[in-house]
């Protein structure tokens, strides 16, 4: 892989991981167009960039979640460990992560078939479009609870399939469940951290060290980190203005084009 290709793939990963248009789908398409299949190490590094981006963007929330979890653990002997909403959030994140972990392990041996199909990408983008468009009528003032945490976690699990946007699926589902807009944003982004971390660890385990420590990988990591931060800031402004559904038009156009041409 050349530096220019690494830069392009890193930028695409950074933008599409957080914009609700499916990063996995666009990476699959780019690899088909560039006739170059990225190594597991490179994919891990660009995901590391987007993971760092969300941690930096939500650093206060990440700190508070860790703090609440540790405080909850320390309060276990007193019986009031996870009684407050802030103390419950770490548990909701763990519970919401279970579906994607289970489905990911179940589909591990089918990775090549799933990520080698442009048709799956096309169908996935149409599903994403439907979810995004439905947010025109979504919204509410309900708090996060166990049921909604699990429902959003299930939505995250289907984003394993290329073409289905993780952020699009989780934020749309959170809004459709009646969550407050800021609550939906916060939970969706915090929920992504364990999933991305798990994926990153699995990819690094099977990656030779020489494939990780190279200029192309560094370019991919830095470009995905920088563009990831930009994408998060842009997406937050779109959601807060109630315009998440606008991304559905792009997903429909690209999804139909893929199914028609590839």
From Swiss-Prot:
GO molecular function: undecaprenyl-diphosphatase activity
Protein's UniProt keywords contain Transmembrane helix: yes
Disulfide bridge map: none
Name used for this protein in its record: Undecaprenyl-diphosphatase
InterPro entries, per the entry: UppP (IPR003824)
Known function: Catalyzes the dephosphorylation of undecaprenyl diphosphate (UPP).
TM region(s), chain numbering: 15-35, 38-58, 91-111, 114-134, 149-169, 189-209, 219-239, 242-262
Enzyme class, first EC level, given as a word: hydrolase
Predominant place of localization: membrane
UniProt EC number: 3.6.1.27
Catalytic activity: di-trans,octa-cis-undecaprenyl diphosphate + H2O = di-trans,octa-cis-undecaprenyl phosphate + phosphate + H(+)
């Amino acid at each position: 892989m050349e530096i220019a290709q690494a830069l392009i793939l890193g930028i695409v990963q950074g933008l599409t991981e957080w914009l609700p248009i499916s990063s996995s789908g666009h990476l699959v398409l780019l690899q088909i167009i560039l006739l170059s299949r990225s190594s597991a190490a490179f994919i891990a590094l660009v995901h590391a960039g987007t993971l760092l981006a969300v941690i930096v963007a939500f650093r206060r929330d990440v700190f508070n979640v860790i703090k609440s979890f540790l405080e909850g653990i320390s309060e276990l002997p007193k019986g009031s460990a996870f009684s407050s909403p802030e103390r419950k959030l770490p548990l909701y994140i763990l519970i919401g992560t279970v579906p994607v972990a289970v489905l990911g392990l179940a589909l591990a041996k089918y990775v090549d078939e799933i990520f080698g199909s442009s048709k799956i990408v096309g169908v996935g983008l149409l599903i994403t479009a439907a979810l995004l468009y439905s947010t025109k009528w979504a919204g509410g003032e309900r708090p996060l609870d166990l049921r909604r945490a699990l429902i959003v976690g299930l939505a995250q699990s289907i984003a394993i399939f290329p073409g289905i946007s993780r952020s699009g699926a989780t934020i749309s589902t959170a809004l459709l469940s009646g969550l407050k807009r800021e609550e939906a944003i916060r939970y969706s982004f915090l929920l992504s951290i364990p999933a991305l971390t798990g994926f990153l660890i699995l990819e690094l385990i099977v990656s030779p060290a020489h494939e990780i420590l190279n200029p192309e990988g560094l370019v991919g990591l830095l470009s995905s980190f920088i563009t990831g931060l930009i994408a998060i800031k842009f997406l937050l402004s779109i959601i807060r203005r109630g315009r998440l559904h606008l991304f559905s038009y792009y997903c429909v156009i690209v999804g139909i084009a893929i199914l028609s041409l590839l």
